[in-house]
Amino acid sequence: MKRRWKKFLAGVLSAALALNLAAPLALAGSSTIGAACSVTSVFLYPEYVGRVDGENVSCIQGEVSYDHGLLTFHGDVTLTTVGVADLGTVPLVKALSEKNLRLVANGKVTGRTKGNGIEEAKEIAGGEYDLTYADLGAYLDTKPNGILGGDTGTTITAGTEITLKDFHTGIGGGDVRINGTVNITGAMFEGATYGIANFTTMNPGSELEIHADRYIRKDCLLTYNGGHLLMIVAENGDGNNIVQGRLSIGNDVSRFWYRTDENGAYTEINMKENYENFTAAIGQNQDYLELTDVDPDQPESE
């Protein structure tokens, strides 16, 4: 009798343990209260540790894991919320109760969505991200963001490469700090598309390339502390790309070089001597504007 009772208790304990381990992961349609973050249609809870798999196999292809605020993409991974995995305007990745969500990729993450790309992650660290907005008909209604910064800021670390294609806005939301490389390709449709629509900071060693109707939205600011900045107006741009008051040079920058033509010569700007030359240039519409903190005449090291 005692042996049977022990077996019964062991079975109950095993079932409870299995239920407890499964609980931290829920699919779309389940209760999402208290979820730490979501990846396509999958909601992850704070204590969850393990592999992330989608309800629809097309949503997540490749290996993704989660461990207490750390979302890791192992090798090449594809995320999608369109086509056979149609989830409406669901973002590819979204931080919820986890305000320090950290994304790490050691391969390439390819994403297609009808909503935002990455929402409110604290840090995007390492790897390559190629994200595309794929609902052209609803573009002006959805106004999707490639990266939506978090309330406490989002950092793109050095060594991270991000390409954002056809989003209404490349980077919006809370403050974003760029230490890596970001390439924003504006959508080729009627209506304003923005490269930057928040407060974004470029740091030394970073790269930011913007192809958009408007480089920086009104009342927003791009602070340049160094790196390589390239802004090119989209083919359907309306010619209104004055960035004076929207592009700020950081206090620690002593000099930089700029040009307003791809084949033109660079002009060196010394902040204490001829900064007014640069302010005059950005006070006019520029279909092309490029800044660098590395002397373009300096020979490249082998």
Residue ranges of model-derived segments:
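A composition-driven surface/loop motif
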Residues: 11, 29-302
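Hydrophobic core
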Residues: 13, 17-21
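Bacterial Sec-dependent N-terminal signal peptides
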Residues: 1-12, 21-30
